[in-house]
């Protein structure tokens, strides 16, 4: 929770902690098979460590998904990322998951960097939100065997799983979880045609709630599913009526139309 889609960057520190506390209270104490992951990441190593420690003292979190720093992008080299994440992992009381989101940050965690960081026992995985399948395959090849390589891009869920990713952390999973699960099951059971067919249905929705209409698009889709989506924070804008109709069409293509609500 509180990764890119959770608008972490739009929350102040008190709001950030309150959201994590509320989610933890709703989930309850460590349900079997569930990993409670909180998004984290400031522009400095020190800031990120302090953030992780503050949350860990207040809430039981199983792992932190830590986005790359990016403001001083020309200076954020791969070596700088290695030092950054190693220091965070040394200080974190719970495991760390790397988060590579180059579309938003302009910073990519290269396969060789992921491999180097996978040597740290407290760094347990990476969420790769790019659609670079060659890079994903190379990462899987280079990291340690028990290192979790996850896709964060719903438009390539089938392809990423087929390439060897062990799962995904997906915005589209908030509104089409059953389809995502069925793609996972189809890939793991060798039903490649079924997985491909399901992906064809999922991709337009995955695009609609991310790159096309952004976080506002996802919130609109949540409302259509009967949840409270709410508004995005300025300067982000709410989707237009035309955009909402497109989102509804994409949503209905993944499930019976009667499940989508106005």
Predicted regions and their residues:
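Active-site beta->alpha loop and helix N-cap motifs at the rims of alpha/beta catalytic domains
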Residues: 1-108
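A non-catalytic, amphipathic alpha-helix used as a structural packing/dimerization or gating element
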Residues: 18, 22, 50, 83, ...
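Conserved short secondary-structure transition element at the edge of the structured enzyme core
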Residues: 161-164, 201-236
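Flexible, glycine/charged-enriched surface loops at secondary-structure junctions
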Residues: 196, 212-215, 259-262
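A general structural signal for well-ordered alpha-helical segments in protein cores
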Residues: 16, 20, 48, 52, ...
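Structural signal for hydrophobic packing residues in well-ordered secondary-structure cores
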Residues: 24-31, 121, 143, 184-191, ...
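Flexible C-terminal active-site loop/helix
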Residues: 227-262
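Catalytic alpha/beta core domains of metabolic enzymes, predominantly
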Residues: 87-91, 102-210
């Amino acid at each position: 929770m509180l990764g890119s889609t959770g608008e972490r960057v739009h929350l102040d520190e008190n709001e950030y902690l309150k959201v994590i506390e509320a989610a933890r209270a709703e989930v309850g104490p460590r349900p079997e098979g569930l990993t409670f992951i909180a998004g984290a990441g400031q522009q400095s190593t020190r800031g990120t460590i302090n953030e992780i420690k503050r949350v860990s003292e207040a809430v039981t979190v199983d792992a932190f998904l830590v986005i790359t720093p990016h403001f001083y992008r020309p200076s954020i080299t791969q070596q700088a990322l290695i030092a950054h994440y190693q220091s965070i992992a040394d200080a974190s009381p719970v495991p760390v998951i790397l988060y590579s989101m180059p579309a938003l940050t302009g910073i990519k965690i290269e396969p060789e960097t992921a491999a180097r960081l996978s040597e740290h026992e407290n760094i347990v995985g990476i969420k790769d939100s790019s659609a670079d399948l060659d890079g994903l395959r190379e990462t899987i090849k280079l990291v340690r065997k028990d290192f979790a390589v996850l896709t964060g891009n719903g438009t390539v869920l089938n392809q990423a799983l087929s390439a060897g990713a062990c799962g995904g952390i997906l915005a589209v999973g908030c509104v089409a979880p059953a389809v995502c699960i069925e793609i996972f099951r189809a890939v793991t059971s060798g039903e490649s045609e079924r997985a491909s067919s399901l992906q064809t249905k999922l991709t337009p929705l995955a695009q609609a709630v991310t790159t096309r209409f952004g976080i506002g698009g996802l919130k609109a889709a949540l409302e259509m599913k009967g949840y409270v989506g709410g508004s995005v924070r300025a300067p982000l804008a709410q989707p237009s009526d035309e955009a909402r109709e497109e989102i509804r069409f994409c949503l209905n293509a993944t499930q019976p139309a009667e499940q989508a609500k106005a």
